[in-house]
A protein has these predicted regions:
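Residue(s) in the substrate-gating loop at a strand-loop-helix junction
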Residues: 109
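Conserved glycine-rich Rossmann-like NAD(P)H-binding loop of the short-chain dehydrogenase/reductase
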Residues: 1-12
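C-terminal helical subdomain
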Residues: 144, 151, 172-203, 210-212
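Substrate-binding pocket helix/loop in short-chain dehydrogenase/reductase
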Residues: 65-66, 73-78, 162, 173
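Alpha-helical segment proximal to the catalytic Tyr-Lys
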Residues: 94, 136, 140-141, 201
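The beta1-alpha1 cofactor-binding region of Rossmann-like NAD(H)/NADP(H)-dependent oxidoreductases
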Residues: 7-8, 28-39, 71, 186-187
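Active-site helix of classical SDR
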Residues: 89, 127, 135
Length: 217
């Protein structure tokens, strides 16, 4: 089951998955709207009876300096990256608690750990750092219900944004990556699949860096 603010985007992804032989469904919802989130979760539970895995992948960014940033800019970034994540996680956790089982994986970022350096401004980095703290605290609250909550922190990934970068800027970013290349989306997906599996049953409150060595801690 996938969710997007745009139904056409959902439908396109669902069709792509169906061609691969995957049973899929897509729902349009604004994750920053509490009522829309509740309705979404209710629809999914009505149809499938349970929710085993939640992957929080919704996010937005903006390249702007602190000097040029506005309070509205900060609110907009946090509204999706943190507040929307909170709303869907809160709603899904109630379902998972009743099941005594759940896997939650949040998409944070290397920017949330080292403070920018790839895309986005300080407000983006701050929102992704907030996700890390939220996940750790949540782990202490829900572990007793058989629910794990972890983060993945991608660095530079081979997406359309990366491909659109000017060569000079791209070369400068690559120079800071020991592996000398951007990551692939499949490499991020592999980590998410592991954290969402039963094999990761004793891992919670953790963060996995996927950045080719550009940040190590």
């Amino acid at each position: 089951v996938i969710c997007d603010i745009n139904q056409a985007g959902c439908d396109a992804n669902v069709e792509e998955m169906k061609k691969m032989g995957i049973e899929a469904a897509g729902y349009a919802a604004n994750l920053t709207d509490p009522d829309a989130v509740k309705e979404l979760v209710n629809k999914i539970v009505e149809k499938y009876g349970r929710i085993d895995v939640l992957v929080n992948n919704a996010g937005i960014s903006q390249k702007v300096t602190v000097a040029d940033m506005t309070l509205d800019d900060i609110k907009r970034i946090f509204s999706v990256n943190m507040f929307g994540l909170f709303l869907i996680t809160q709603a899904v956790c109630e379902v998972m608690k009743k099941q005594k089982y759940g896997r939650i994986v949040h998409l944070s970022s290397v920017s949330g750990k080292r403070g920018g350096g790839v895309f986005g401004g300080a407000h983006y980095s701050a929102s992704k750092a907030a996700v890390l703290g939220f996940s750790k605290n949540l782990a202490r609250e829900v572990s007793q219900y058989g629910i794990t909550t972890n983060c993945v922190c991608p660095g530079l990934i081979n997406t359309e944004i990366w491909k659109s970068m000017p060569k000079e800027q791209a070369d400068a970013v690559i120079a800071g990556i020991p592996m000398g290349r951007p990551g692939e989306t499949q490499e991020v997906a592999n980590a998410i699949v592991f954290l969402a599996s039963k094999e990761a049953s004793y891992i919670t409150g953790e963060e996995i860096d996927i950045n080719g060595g550009s940040h190590m801690d």
